[in-house]
Amino acid sequence: MIPTLAPGEEVWVLRTRRLRPGDIAVFRDPRDRDLILIKRVVRREPGGWWVEGEISGEHLPDSHTFGPVDPGMILGRLPRRR
């Protein structure tokens, strides 16, 4: 999530499943529920939320890899920065 977040940066998470495009979502990895991912919400799709990382061209897991994120996998979102 660089440039928004640096590797290892600690974050506050607002516990909610209410998202909108532009939010930064915190969710369980659909491929391994023990992992937690942080990605930007792009849009709502049938079956869930389309999320993407901020580094284009990188082969990091996002909805291009695992498809839309089921709303039940959402743990929350990061507070909006001013």
Report the location of each language-model feature:
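Extended hydrophobic leader/signal-anchor segments used for secretion and membrane insertion
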Residues: 1-82
